[in-house]
Structure formats: structure tokens, C-alpha cells
Amino acid sequence: MMRIKRMGPFALTGALILALLTAPTAPALTFKQIPATNWGHIYAGTEASVTQTAPAKSKNLEIKSKFSVKYNNFPEWAKKEVQASVDVWSANFKSSVVVTVDASWGRSSSWGVLGSARPGSFFSAFSGAPDPSLWYASALANALAGKDLDKANPEIVIQVNSAAPWNTRGDGSPTGSEYDLQSVFLHEIGHGLGFLSNDSYDPFFGLGSLDQPTPFDAYLQTSDGRRLADLPTPSKELGVALTTSLVWSGANAIKANGGVKPKMYTPARYESGSSTSHLDEATFSKSGVDSVMTPSLDPGEIFKEPGALLLAMMEDLRSKPPVGMATDLPLSPRNAQAFTGDSSALISFDPPANLRTAQITEYIVKNLKTGSERKTLTSPVLITGLKNGTSYTFSVASKNGS
């Protein structure tokens, strides 16, 4: 049965006479943006490997996007390795917007890290967002929106450890004691494009936090089928989920993985930059090309392509994740306000406190004077066709499908 929770009516009286406040059609009706602070790492493995994927086909591949890399302190041999990985992603990531990458070469402050990456920012509630309540990595958000949402900053930021024992010969054949830079960049660009959780963990209290879930987070499921993005935050319940078993629920990835939900890397001891944001090491480390997004790269191990599983997961990120299980009735939307304009009103509100546990599917803004309703997924809502000099009262209701 459908559940609806209404917020008490609030009045908009007399304000339309003078239109003292002009409805902020922009930027209020565009999108929200937050900085990206979580990094996805790839660590240096210790097991000498001869695992090598087949070289990319020599035929001309269709270019689906353009990447522009800003190099900071990179040696010439390394630039060629980076460009090779960029060319692979250009043929596999579809976007009409140039993906700018800020890449830095220097010693890592973390022992064992080969490379790290993060998106430039996260965006939500933009036109084209499959789920406006989730936060999309810059490059993915731009691809879905069809425009650059932040022209002042790069879409991806990558740092590479210059002190690692790299194969500098450019022959694509690292020895059993060398690491392949192209493979590291193939991995890190994946993080920058959105293969990344926005969670955090407090090891002292065992608390997990996920204040701004990404679509990546929304596709992660606990063993009992709950979405990671729907668990209370901060909470020990979320902390337990981050350090036990999580699987991917996207249909494309399940199909690519032989009908099995891919298992994610969630060790009992949480590892910042590795936990949650990688495929499980034990499950996929020997799976050839599908081990690209495991948390470590062994010496001698190389990849020339993302692999079917990673590409399927990236495709899932472009769709709306399945709705989670509602465990609560929707509470009222909070902090409703009305901004007036000429013959119009902009109604803004915040989601109810139990947005996740109630699985809110839409909001209904009702003009109590006329009886007309507007359904929306996000705030604010622009109401037009009002008569200047007339008082109006509106209500806002939250609804889920349970």
C-alpha cells in the first residue's frame, strides 16, 4: 500500500502583489555540488605475476569521448604510458564533454600505494541524473547532463608514486619485480569516472558514515539485500556492513559475471581507499582482465583493457539503481519555504529525516486554493500561473511505494 506523509500547509499571502523576492530560477533549479574527498588507491602487490591481458586490438576503435591530461612533473616515458590508458578509456567511456585529468607525479605519503584517484567533485539533482538524490562523479555527471557542470576544475585528479619500481622501457612487459604504469592508470581512471564509494569509517567506535551516497554506493547490497546507501548514518550498523560482505546489484554486471552478483572488497579491518571501492581480491585476482579493479597490482601484472565486468558496472552507473526496501513510513518534508515572483512561486523544502529508510519515491506540492498538484523528485519546484494580489497556501507531501 502506498504511504504518503503530508507537511502541514503553509501560506503564501500577499507577497505576489509586490513580488519582493524574485524566484531564483538559476542556480536553484540546476544542480548541487560537493567536493570529492575520498580517494581510490591501488597498492603494490608482492606476488610476482605473469598475468597479462591480450593487447588491445590494433584496428581503429570508435572514439566515444575525449580526455585532456594536465601533466605535473611526469617524465616523458610515463606520459606515453598514461596516454595509452587514456586512449583505451576514450574508446570505452561515452561522453560529449571533454574529460579533463589533473595528473601528478611524486612520492606517495602512503607506503605501498602505486596510484590514487578521485573525481573533481560530485553532483546531484542535475538535468539527466538517473536518481537526483545520489551524487555522481564529475565526468559521469557531465556525460549524463550533456554539458560541463564545472568548467573551472578537472573531472579527475590522479596522483602516481614516482618512487615505485616502474617498468620504464615502454615495452609493455614488466619483469617480476616491476610495475606497469599503464595498468595503474587504467585502474585509477576507473575510480575517477565513478567507481568509488563515498563512505568513511571510524575504527575506534566502529561507526560507518555515508552522508552523500553515490550511485556506486546505491548498487552495493548487504547479505540480506539492503542497499548500503539506505543504512542509517553514522551508525554501527553501517560500520558492520562496510567490514562484512557486500555485493553489486546492477543487472549489467550480474550478467557479465555469469549471473552472480559480483563480490566487493570488504576486509574485516577497514582499509581507507581500498575497502568497498574495489572488487574482491580473493574472488577476482586470478580472473584475468576482470581483476583490473581489485585493490592491488602485482609486479609483472599488466592490463590493456578495462574488461567486460568493469564496463558493465560503469554502464550500471548510468541507470537508476533499484529501489531499496522501505523499513519506515515517510516523515514530513522539512524547512518548506516559498519565494515569490511575478505570477509564480518557488517552493523549496528539505527531504524528511528518514529519506533513506522510508525510500521516498516522490514529493507532491499541492496548491490548496486551486487543488492543482505538482509531482517532483527534488526541491525546489516552480509553480507558475498564479494571480498577482491573491493569497495561496501550499502543502508538501512525501511518498513511497510501500
Placement of each model-derived feature along the sequence:
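Secretory targeting and sorting signals
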Residues: M2-A28
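Extracellular zinc-dependent metalloprotease catalytic-domain scaffold
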Residues: L29-L186, G192-A326
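Extracellular acidic, Ser/Thr/Pro-rich low-complexity tracts
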Residues: A91-F93, P351-R356, N400
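Proline-enriched interdomain boundary motifs that mark the N-terminal boundary
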Residues: T327-Q337
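Conserved aromatic anchor
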Residues: D342-I360
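Short beta-strand elements bearing conserved aromatic residues within extracellular beta-rich modules
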Residues: T361-V365
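Short beta-strand segments within Ig-like beta-sandwich modules, predominantly Fibronectin type-III
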Residues: S372-T378
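Beta-strand-rich modules
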Residues: I383-S402
